[in-house]
Amino acid sequence: TKTLNLHCPINGTSYGYVSCNIIKELNKLGYDLRYIPIAQPTPDEHFIADIKSALQRWDYDHDAPSLKIWHQHGLNSFVGRGLKIGMPIFELEKFNAVEVHSLNNPDELFVCSNWAKEVIQSEIPKRANNVRVVHLGFDEEIFKPIDLPSSETTIFANFGKFEVRKGHDILPLIFNKAFERHDNVTLIMMPTNFFLNQEETNTWVNKYKNTKLGHKIQFIDRVPDQKLLYQIMSQVHCGIFPSRAEGWNLEALELLACGRHLIITDCTAHTEFCNSENSNLIKMNSGYESAIDKKFFDGSFEWRKISQDEIDQAVEYLRSIHRKHQSGDLSLNNAGVETSKNFTWKNTVNMVDKNIEEMT
């Protein structure tokens, strides 16, 4: 049996969801997992059976390797004397001094995309030989290809918490520019952000509702489990993600796995699985701008800029998907389904296992 100390959160955040899937698959490989919590574990119900054994093992192994799945600024503390592996998920292409110091602490780093690996190699050259790509995944038991909805309305959707980084300030402009009141279209939004208060959330919602097509935009609460998310995704024709910076983009991959179409920016981590065969790529021609949203990013660094050029590309893609659906020519995104087969959680954990074996 291989023993691994696992230091990660178990909750409803992206980090928590990634951690639960990795624990579940490591168990299947017969790992003896010792769990060191980050914050109070609050697992989704359908994960409890799979991760219960790990949660009960507080007695970390002093000599086993430790894998910590956490932010780039939080890789300073590990348990035991074994190999220390940090697995951060980051969105920007530069690090501050605190992050560099933290990223220099683990013996090895796992990052989830080749884009992220290049960022580490360029920003922290002395780590160049200690960084490996371990992509994230999707749940193939849940997100299966399913026929596109037969509704006359063309249904677009965006998943991901309200943030400037994710292009939520630009999306209402794009949607309103693409269509008129008489167009048979809907935009579904699932943007719950636990870090925002009610007033901040209302300000975001009004950016959408108080527009020409506000009545065609539908907000839904974040769903507590993946099966419900799949039901929503199966009612959608196309996802739209005008994101300036992503650390992975779980929902975009899940949409591809369902055979949905994507309109998405051609930058940062989701370039790992989004390409010109399976996605309508928004080429990022406008360079960079200060990464600032007065909430999560203070403008110290930059992210991709979205200007008229990128907006116009997105508008054209939206209209094109709508035209195809209206004329009966929009079929399942088979290229997306094929791509997704390489990105299961099982594959993720096989890469974790193979890399740990090579390193120890």
Locate the predicted segments by residue.
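Conserved donor-binding/catalytic core segment of Leloir-type glycosyltransferases
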Residues: 4, 149-166, 172-175, 187-189
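Nucleotide-activated donor-binding/catalytic signature segment of Leloir-type glycosyltransferases, i.e.
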Residues: 198-227
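Short alpha-helical donor nucleotide-sugar binding micro-motif in glycosyltransferases
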Residues: 230-236
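Aromatic "clamp/platform" in nucleotide-sugar-dependent glycosyltransferases that forms part
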Residues: 244
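A charged, aromatic-enriched C-terminal amphipathic alpha-helix characteristic of glycosyltransferases
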Residues: 305-316, 323-354
